[in-house]
Amino acid sequence: MVKAVPTPEEIRAAHPMDKELQEIKAKRDAEIKKIFTGESDKFIAIIGPCSADYENSVLDYLCRLAAVAEKIKDKVFVIPRIYTNKPRTNGSGYKGMLHQPNPEDKPDFIEGVKAIRKMHIKAIRETGLTAADEMLYTDNWPYLEDILSCLLYTSDAADD
């Protein structure tokens, strides 16, 4: 069975960022810009595991990371690494939450997009931290562009 893939606009409308979270993201993005343009002498640290597969574990980790980030905020700007993709160069293997939200089930891109939007939104709400994620396919960016503060396009040769 072939399912129609919702547009990024449809997904964002179904799983929106509220105004408070939009303001948090705008503030953090402005701080990142200041760091990259030299207006701030802070150091950016993108910190976290290489894979975010289970929401509860991710949120537990992020709550602890937020406490550390608060202690060092005058010198270091922490961006949590919430990598929901596991890019593979040859196409086989587990590709992360985006493509397979439950590692025990079959791949489901639509449910994956919904799951990672919900997780990223919950992470911002609970910690005040906007995240970095990685992607292999540029077409996936519009589904998360209103949530993420940092994106890395990568290719992982783990299956080669």
Say what each PLM segment does:
Residues 144-152:
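Active-site phosphate/pyrophosphate-binding segments
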Residues 153-158:
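Conserved small/polar residues in nucleotide/adenosyl-binding loops
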Residues 48:
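Conserved, mostly hydrophobic/aromatic
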